[in-house]
Amino acid sequence: MPPWNRGQWGANFPPPAGTPPYPRSCGLSTGMKNFHLHLVSDATGETVTSVARACLVQFEGVQPIQHNWWLVRTQGQVERVIAGIEDNPGLVFFTLVDGAVRGLLEEACRHRGIPCISLLDPVMAGLSAFLGVEVTALPGRQYQLDAEYFRRIDAMQFTLSHDDGQLIELADQADIVLVGVSRSSKTPTCMYLANRGFKCANYPLVPGVPLPPELERAKKPLVVGLTKDPKSLSDIRRARLRLLNQEEEADYAQFEKVKEEVQQARRIFSRLGWPVVDVTRRSIEEASATIIQLYERHLEKRGLKAEVLPS
């Protein structure tokens, strides 16, 4: 058995296959909190960055000094990466599919005793074994200009054109419409959903202003009400007013007024039978995941299936 540092993984979590033993001199097993993290990718770096972020948030107090190396596809580019790693040794995460390119990086790290981890190997090996198909090993393949790419662009253009109540008379052309009071994360949530391929519109609820009839009559889109804890919403609005050098005690930010506004919004959602998502303690990604699930059920009732693009 390779000399794994069990303190790194625990008895129930052996290191991934192919992961080199961590040298005890690297300091990771001695409570090290700050370290150099090199992220190496043969494409845009989104995958390796997302996986690294998802892992790092599980460790409190860890502050990596991140070095990004994108579009690494040739020997010369790998040599520059290796030089950078030599200058700031630490931990290396990579997503490289070309065997020759990754071989250079792995050999250099092995020679210098630097831990070097391929994040996609377990997934690719599992898929290959299950499907009985060899991996094609084409870098950046997920970024080809295919139908998914153009669908994403189309969704982004639609969403930008239908932000904050614009062109709400065309709401029935949307996949998803978000409705909520001011500062309830409608626009950023719509943009995230658009990046997943959904045509989105959003409409702000303003006290004393009735809903447009086109929105109430819309049958095709999933209409979702967004709500937020009044205290949190009041604080956010006050911060917004401070940023704009405006009076913080305006009705817009007063707690009692905000509370009444939120209650009125909930009554509207209930009357129209719209599902409600409370975004108080949810990130944009978490709220969007809930909305996507609602949309999938919305389509199932019509005998359809949602096609969700990867993030």
From Swiss-Prot:
EC code(s) of this entry: 2.7.11.32, 2.7.4.27
Keyword Nucleotide-binding appears in the UniProt entry: yes
Uppermost EC category: transferase
Residues that coordinate or bind ADP: G180, V181, S182, R183, S184, S185, K186, T187
Record GO terms (molecular function): ADP binding; ATP binding; phosphotransferase activity, phosphate group as acceptor; protein serine/threonine kinase activity
Reactions catalysed, as given in the entry: N(tele)-phospho-L-histidyl/L-threonyl-[pyruvate, phosphate dikinase] + ADP = N(tele)-phospho-L-histidyl/O-phospho-L-threonyl-[pyruvate, phosphate dikinase] + AMP + H(+); N(tele)-phospho-L-histidyl/O-phospho-L-threonyl-[pyruvate, phosphate dikinase] + phosphate + H(+) = N(tele)-phospho-L-histidyl/L-threonyl-[pyruvate, phosphate dikinase] + diphosphate
Pfam families in the cross-refs: Kinase-PPPase (PF03618)
Record's keyword annotation contains Transferase: yes
Keywords: Kinase, Nucleotide-binding, Serine/threonine-protein kinase, Transferase
InterPro entries linked: Kinase-pyrophosphorylase, PPDK_reg
Role according to the record: Bifunctional serine/threonine kinase and phosphorylase involved in the regulation of the pyruvate, phosphate dikinase (PPDK) by catalyzing its phosphorylation/dephosphorylation.
Family named by the database record: Belongs to the pyruvate, phosphate/water dikinase regulatory protein family. PDRP subfamily.
Protein name: Putative pyruvate, phosphate dikinase regulatory protein
Taxonomic lineage: Bacteria, Pseudomonadati, Pseudomonadota, Alphaproteobacteria, Rhodospirillales
